[in-house]
Amino acid sequence: MKEKVNVTGVPETMVQTLYARAKETRKKNAQINDEIAVELVKKLDYDFSKADKDNAMTYGVIARTIVLDRMVEQYLKKHANTVVVNIACGLDTRCYRMEGKYLRWYNVDLPEAMKIRKQFLTETGPVYQITKSAMDDSYVDDIDYHGENVLVIIEGLTMYLNEKGIKKIFSIIEKSFQEVTVMVETMSPFVVKHVKEKSIEGSNAKFTWGVKNGKELQRIISEFSVQQEVSLVEGMKELMPIYHVIGKIPTVRNISNKIIVMEKHG
């Protein structure tokens, strides 16, 4: 029996991205494998018709998944016993794809998002759920932390916030963890201004913030230094071969979302 899911605004995007991953997984030559997403979509009583038609959103989600999965896996191979903090997790299932490669994994999100996650995913260790905002200092009190290396993932969130909110999130991270790396997805100001996702039309979710590159982000987040910057063009290359050509065009790379890797100053 399917369970009815009522979501509005930003939390609605978590259902849309889940569907995108499930849709790709079901393809014959799928570029990702997210069987949990497939099973969750089967259980959800939700109208996915808009998401089904929003190819731009689907390609973006899959490209991001390809790139971030690769980056997170490489990081965890180099850093044993890492504590992972996944901010604005929604219905993300990366913790299962990376199973056995981390010490503890904390999925953090707002109450309305976590209410839905808890309906379908029981996480009691080494994956845990924290029902709080990433701008609430107290969420770190729920993390079992003893000076271990920490990896923070911020995916699909910053474009819905403002600069004050971004600074608050990074300030909490900086104050709370000794050795910490942040992998954060950013959107270009051009896309923020000119693009609207078809799949969330009519919702309260709107793009509100972006930066051109890592240098611009570092000027805002001075306590961290940029270590790496990866365009989602790298993921698009595996979905659409034409991106091996057009991905070399500076304008294309500049307006594509990026994963920026930042480390706290020692």
What do these predicted ranges mean?
Residues 204-234:
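Short alpha-helix
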Residues 1-85, 89-132, 145-146:
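Rossmann-like AdoMet
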Residues 138-147:
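Short amphipathic alpha-helix with an adjacent loop that forms part of the alpha/beta core around
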Residues 240-266:
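Core SAM-dependent methyltransferase catalytic element
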Residues 152-153:
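A conserved beta-strand element that flanks and buttresses the S-adenosyl-L-methionine
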Residues 176-189:
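Conserved beta-strand signature within the Rossmann-like core of class I S-adenosyl-L-methionine
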Residues 160-173:
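A short, conserved alpha-helix within the catalytic core of class I
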Residues 189-205:
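Short, glycine-/aromatic-enriched active-site segment of Class I SAM-dependent methyltransferases
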